Amino acid sequence: MKIGLCESRVKEIRQAYEVGFDFVEVSNWAVYTMEDSKYEDMIKLSKELPEGFMYACNGLVPPDFRLTGPDVNYDTIRDFAEKSFAKLAKLGIKMLVFGSSKAKIVPEGFDFDEAMGQLIKVTQIFGEVAEKNGQRVCIEPLRTEECNIINTAEDSVKLAKDTGCANVGGHVDYYHLMQNGEKMSKLEGLAKDIVHTHIASPCKRNIPTVDDGADYGQFFNYLRKGGYDATVSFEGGGDKTPENLTALCAYLRSL
């Protein structure tokens, strides 16, 4: 399995490569709002690093976008996707992680089924635009405290299938899975429809370590039993020194 780090700054991306990560996952919103000079620095760096090192992105839409509710504007969403996905493509980004909790939250009193229909259409737009750029979209399920729709790996896989887009797939995040109290064993049956994953410690969303009490091996074992052996990114906080990141990279490879 390829091991990645969520990071959008040039210095830290270079450090991720130097300590042994296989790829980085940048923030779409960070890239989209970069000053031109900084974006050019990112393009230059992407050409200096091995092809595919800038592999994924998260933060797909800004929090003030509305993807559910009465204020959804599909033209605005498509326009943003067209512009931002193209900028990502110039960096070599191939996997787009669609979490975006604040933008997805269903407003109080709004019909849930209608909101789900909106998300299907939004994800179809993302899938169509991504396909033109040679990219895939994965739908990240989020803990219930953070979002009130698309909370489980089952939700993620179902939404991906409902779009009818071949380049849209499921996702699972160890931290969100554990926060929701979900059963790890279900991943074996879902793995064939998952295309990317995240990991972080289940309590403080920090760097996973061998002695933090979490059973990360079980997470990987169920995914591999189901046929998944693609990519996992560390998405979380903690003291990201070169020493700690080197240890993290080695630890995740050992699982």
Model-derived segments and spans:
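Glycine-rich, proline-tolerant flexible connector loops at the mouths of alpha/beta enzymes
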Residues: 25-49, 100-107
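Active-site acidic/histidine proton-transfer and metal-coordination neighborhood
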Residues: 67-169
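N-terminal substrate-binding region of glycoside hydrolase catalytic domains
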Residues: 15-39, 58-66
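Short glycine/serine/threonine/alanine-rich loop segments
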Residues: 21, 51-52, 93, 135
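Active-site-proximal loop/turn and secondary-structure-junction residues that shape catalytic pockets
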Residues: 9-11, 28-30, 60-63, 102-104, ...
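Histidine-acidic metal/acid-base catalytic patches
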Residues: 1-4, 9-20, 78-79, 83-86, ...
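A generic structural signal for well-ordered alpha-helical segments
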Residues: 46-50, 88, 130, 223
